[in-house]
Amino acid sequence: MWFKNLTLYRFNKPFAVETEALETALADFTFSPCSSQDVSKFGFSNALGKKGCSLVHSADNRHLICVTKEEKILPGQVIKEALEEKVALIEDEENRKMAKKEKDALKDEIITSLLPRAFSRRSQTHALILPELEMILVDSSSATKAEELLALLRKALGSLPVIPLSFKAPVESNLTEWLKLGSAPLPFEMQDEAELKSEADEGGIVRFKQQDLKEDEVLAHLATGKQVHKLALHFGQSIALLLQSDASVKRLKFSEEFRAGNDEVGTDDPMARLDADFALMGSELVALMHALVAALGGLEDAQV
């Protein structure tokens, strides 16, 4: 359940849907496994996984939701070879060339015949709705997956006025300034990884890892006009992260010491531990968002 990535969105209007109403809305779009002829299925699933019993898990007016996606695996090469074989057979038997429309129809038939025998894979994406911040945090490094989740949530609720998080000043400008100064605003602390890009159309990209970012070798690239587009940071003693210029957060990792804060809860009651971990994570992510917005100079005015 501990989030590993953050794709960030904000509401244009306050989110005022209570837990019970949210649960009811999502219930009409619950996940069901693929049938023999389904290519994929997508829907909401228990927020806390197999041990959970609700689509929404709430604590302190923070709502955790989850979507599950199942996709049939049909290798393109398998379809291509089967199609070529059937096309060759038909063209040989009928002594003619098949039209594109016929080939497309034949391809659909092949896919239909292969679906019942195809393996499938499932993936899950969680999101945390934070009415107090008017934000949604999606645990995904993929903007596409995040948008899929939001699209289904919008369908369930009827409307969802959200936009990607954006700041008054470009994120890369702030990251570049931090690197020049040799430190990030407290409670953030720069680590030993960064990616710098030239703003020129055909400019270069330089990546530093496990290196002191205060060294002249690094700063020399700033002097040539490169800007910082990725920067590894620590948030206090609780979270390690990689902040990117699109305001997304990758490689989010809660420290063992921080997670141990719930050790007194134990593991005898898995649901109690999951609930405690969710409350702990939610509280720290709210603190992280407050600090991030302040460090980056504030959010751009929302467009209603």
Curated annotation (Swiss-Prot):
One of its GO terms (cellular component) is bacterial nucleoid. The keyword Transmembrane helix does not apply. May be involved in recombination. Keywords: Cytoplasm, DNA recombination. The keyword Cytoplasm applies. GO terms for biological process: DNA recombination; regulation of DNA recombination. It holds the Pfam family RdgC. PANTHER family: RECOMBINATION-ASSOCIATED PROTEIN RDGC. GO terms for molecular function: double-stranded DNA binding. This is Recombination-associated protein RdgC. InterPro entries: RdgC. Belongs to the RdgC family. It is found in: Cytoplasm, Nucleoid. Disulfide bonds: none annotated.
